[in-house]
Every structure is written in C-alpha cells, then in structure tokens.
Amino acid sequence: MPDNNSDPAVSMASRALGNPWAGFILALVVIVLDQYTKMWASNELVYRVPVEITSWFDLMLAHNTGAAFSFLASAGGWQRWFLAAVAMLVSVFVAVWLTRLEQQQRILGVSLGLILGGGLGNLIDRVTLGYVVDFISWHYQNWYWPAFNIADSAIFCGAILLLWDSFSSERGESA
C-alpha cells in the first residue's frame, strides 16, 4: 500500500521522533535550557524578591533543598545526597527504558526524554549547589504555588505524556 504522507519533512520528523535516541536529544535540550535559565535567574534576580510579570505570575529566585513542593527541605542536610541518589537511580532506569523503546513508541520516547532531562537538570543543581534553583512563581491573590523551574516543568509534562501514553496504549491506540 502506498504511503499517503507525501510530505518528506513530516515523514522525516515522524521517523526522528520514533527514534529512541530522540529522547536523549530532548533530554539534552531540556538540561541546557534548564541550566541556562537557572544561571540567568541566579545572576539577575534577588533572592526571595519577586519581580511581577503579571498579576498572577512572578519571577522570584528561590533555593529548594528538598524535593517537589519543598518536601524534606528542613530535614537537616542528609536529604541532599539521598535525593541525589534517588534522582540518579531514576535517571538510569529512564535511560535504560529509552534504549528499549520500539520505533512506534513516539509519545513514550518524548515523555521519557522530558523526565530524564528534568531529573538530570535538577540533579546537577543538587550535587553542585546543595539545592535546586527555582524562579517561576504563580499565584492568585494570596495563594502561591511553590516556585519551580524548567526542569520541574519538563518532568510534569513528561509525566502527563506518560499517563496519556499508558491510557491510549491500553485502548489499543498507536501513539
């Protein structure tokens, strides 16, 4: 049966996304963007002083010694290496998973690439600085979402795609 997709650019992009190594390239892009934006935030923002962008969005430099939502942040220091070890183990697991993907598992490859890049971006901070640099702050009136960064956003988007892929795979859809 002839290929109905006659656009070579679309076909090439589809093949590239279907390549399991594309996940590693995406992870590298996430790491570079994450580290660049954290470096910018650390150089340009004053610690804990918000810069209002809109009525619901600020840039504010914060240092998170804990995990997501500052979990374990006040644990006394032991959490740095514990969380680094957990991040390293998860990263190895995700990297191995990426190498075992099949050509048609595009969404799964993207999700794992986002998760790997985000995890490694935060791991770099945790190991080199002892904390993770956060700088994106959303709020509504006096309710504030915990500050986060590009790596956190990549992990979140990757987790959503992972869930979507698992549910669409259960229904027998090809992702």
Residue map of PLM features:
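Alpha-helical transmembrane bundles and membrane-interface segments of multipass inner-membrane proteins
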Residues: M1-A175
